[in-house]
Amino acid sequence: MFQQQKDWETRENAFAAFTMGPLTDFWRQRDEAEFTGVDDIPVRFVRFRAQHHDRVVVICPGRIESYVKYAELAYDLFHLGFDVLIIDHRGQGRSGRLLADPHLGHVNRFNDYVDDLAAFWQQEVQPGPWRKRYILAHSMGGAISTLFLQRHPGVCDAIALTAPMFGIVIRMPSFMARQILNWAEAHPRFRDGYAIGTGRWRALPFAINVLTHSRQRYRRNLRFYADDPTIRVGGPTYHWVRESILAGEQVLAGAGDDATPTLLLQAEEERVVDNRMHDRFCELRTAAGHPVEGGRPLVIKGAYHEILFEKDAMRSVALHAIVDFFNRHNSPSGNRSTEV
C-alpha cells in the first residue's frame, strides 16, 4: 500500500506502460450499469468492488466529463482498499442527452443533477455493505454534491472537493453577464444554444489548455473523446450557465446547513472556477461552527483546474491529502443518517 502511494510521485516517468498494462487490466474489471433519473433520463455509472473492502468512495465528476476519464483515480483508490462508484451526470458521458445536439452542455434545472445523485445514493450507495461512505467531487460535481449534502445531512462520512464550482470565471462584468443570460432565458432559440464563445466539441492543443500541466494525462483524456464520439460534450448553453451561477449562490446560502467533514482543495493557477467563492464558503462554514478541514482551502501550488489530472508532483500532494483525510474519518463510531 505504501509503495502504491509512492508510485504516485513518479508515474509519469513510465505513464504509457502503466496505462497500457496495470490500468487497462484494472479497467476490464469494471461493472457498468444505469438507473433512471429525473424525467426518465438514463444515468450511467461504473463500479469497482472487492469483497474485503468496507469503505466506498463515490466520485462525482465535473462538466463534460465521463467516468472513463477517471480510471486512474479509481485504480489508486481501489488499491488502497476503497470500493469506487463513479456517476456520469445527465447530458454527458454515457448518460442520456437532453437536446437534439448531443454536444450541447445542458440541464433543465441544476437541481436535476442533485436529484439524480440522491436517487443514485438511495439505490446504489446506501444499501451497500460499506462501513464508511465518502464523496470525492470535482468542479460541477462539487456543487452537485454539496447541494446534495445540504439537503440530506449526515448521509456521508466525509467529502473531498477539488476545485468545486461555487462560482464561474466569466470574463465580463457580472451585471452584464446577468443581463445577457436573462435576455437569453426569454428567447428559447438562444436559451438552449451555445453560450457566446463556445461551440461543439473539438480537440484543443495541449499548449493552450488551462486544465492541466500534465501532457500525458491531457493527451490520454483527449483520446477518450476522440475515439468515442458518443461521450463528447462541447460548450454549455446559456441556460446551463444561468442555472450554474444560481447553484453556486445556493451553495453559499446553505453553507451553514451541513456539518459533513469537508476537505476543499483549490488550484493555485485556477482559470475556470472562482476561487474567491471557495474562500467565502469556508468563512461561512466556520461562522456556522462547521469549519472545513484546516479552516480554509488547501491550495495546490502551481495547479490548474483539474488537480487530480495534474503532473505527478501536484497530483500526489492532493491525493495524499484526500486519502489521509478519509483515513482520519474512519472511526467505527458515528451518527451518519441512513435516510435520503
UniProtKB/Swiss-Prot annotation:
Please give the Pfam families that the UniProt record associates with this protein.
Hydrolase_4 (PF12146)
| EC assignment | 3.1.1.5
Show the GO cellular component annotation of the record.
Answer: membrane; plasma membrane
Compartmental location = Cell inner membrane
Membrane topology note = Peripheral membrane protein
A molecular function GO annotation = acyltransferase activity, transferring groups other than amino-acyl groups
- Alphabetical GO biological process terms: glycerophospholipid metabolic process
What this protein catalyses is:
a 1-acyl-sn-glycero-3-phosphocholine + H2O = sn-glycerol 3-phosphocholine + a fatty acid + H(+)
Supply the alphabetized keyword list.
Answer: Cell inner membrane, Cell membrane, Hydrolase, Lipid biosynthesis, Lipid metabolism, Membrane
Q: Which InterPro entries does the protein's record reference?
A: AB_hydrolase_fold, Hydrolase_4, MAG_DAG_Lipase
Which SUPFAM superfamilies would you find in this protein's record? alpha/beta-Hydrolases (SSF53474)
Name the predominant localization. Answer: membrane
EC category name: hydrolase
The record's annotation in NCBIfam families points to: PRK10749.1
Report further notes: In addition this protein catalyzes a transacylation reaction to produce acyl phosphatidylglycerol by transfer of the acidyl residue of 2-acyl lysophospholipid to phosphatidylglycerol. Lysophospholipases from various sources vary widely in molecular weight, substrate specificity, and subcellular localization.
PANTHER family linked to this entry: PHOSPHOLIPASE-RELATED (PTHR11614)
Q: What is the official name of this protein in its record?
A: Lysophospholipase L2
Q: What is the source species?
A: Escherichia coli (strain K12)
What's the gene?
pldB
